Every structure is written in structure tokens, then in C-alpha cells.
Amino acid sequence: IGQIYGIRKDYPNAILWYKKAIRKNYIDYMAHWFLADIYTSTNRVNDAVDEIVIAKILNRNNPRIQNAMEAIFTKAKIHYEDWCFNPQYELGKNADSSINVTADEKWLGFALVKAVWEYEPGYRESMGVAKNNYAIIEDRESIISLYMGLTNSKTKFNKDPQFKVLKKALDEKFMDPYIIYEIILPKTPSAAYQLSEEVINLMKEYVLKIRCDK
């Protein structure tokens, strides 16, 4: 219904119906996306920013949402650098059961923690996580180890956007949003549908406060 009103340029009713759809189902990414379009058409740029970011969180890899977000951010004078979290390491188990860790120097701390979670007998279970299951604590430990390694080696964080944003996220206490937005959602976009409205809005704050430059 909101789309019909939007096509007719009856923007007040379009907004009303999109908001109804969102109240009924907060994880409806299309409602947030189309509401952002309506807000853009009515020069409510700040509201458009909020809605398109939520749509981006709910459908992390959609290229059309990415394009819409970039267009809205341009109007709002917000800079969003589009990069991917890309850890440089490989793990393997040798014939003699020894573990092989190959990693870029900067990623060694991250890789070693991943190796412990993957291969250390009983470690995963000792952390309350069943075998073959995922829990965010694994990436928390990996990220903290990565950060400590970068800090100890006096790495210049600003030279790599992954590290620059990581430092900012940890400084501002946004570690979990960093993990969800940068690591989990790009690999498993459907995980967004299990996020609460509160967490989604915290993610939005992360994107606008940590990920973006104004």
C-alpha cells in the first residue's frame, strides 16, 4: 500500500503505511528502504539516513541498497568507505596432527585464537559452545588478540580501514556491532533477522558514529 501512495506522490500516506509495516515487522528491510526513498523525496534527509542504514543492516549485501545508501549519504554529506573485513590467514592440520598456522604478520594474533577455537580439544566446549556451533565470544577473543598484536607492534591503524574502524569501535565500546556488521552479516546476511530492534538500532549507531565520517 505504501508503494501505491508513493507512486501517486501521496507522501504523507506512503509514510504512514510504511511505518505501519515497520511496526508490524521491524525486520522488513524493504519497508525501511522504501521509507528512506520517500524521506529523500520530501527532503527529510536525516530520517532517510536512519532508514537506509537499517535497510542496509537487514540486507547487508544488497547492491541496490548500497547504491541507495551512497546516494542518500552524499546528500547528507556523510562519507562511507565500502571495504570488507578480510583476515589474512590459513589454518590446517598436518598428517602428524600438528597444527599449521599461516598468517600475515598483522593477522597472527587473530589467526592463533581461531586455531585454538578450531583445534584445541575441549576449548570450545569449555567456553560453553557446542561443537560446530558459532558464538560471538569466538570473534570477541580473536578481535581482542588482533588489536593487542597491532598495538604491541606499533602498527599505524589509519593505513588500513579495517584496523582504523576496529580501533575506533573498541575505543567507543562498539566491539559487538563491529563483529556483527563487519564479520557476521557479510557472510550470513540472514542472521540480521534474529536481531532485536534494540540491537538493530545499536548497529545503526555503529554505522553512523564509527563506520562513517561526517
Model-derived features: positions:
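Helix-start (N-cap) detector for alpha-helical repeat units in TPR-like alpha-solenoids
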Residues: 29-30, 63
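Alpha-helical linker/edge segments of TPR/alpha-solenoid repeat scaffolds
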Residues: 72-98
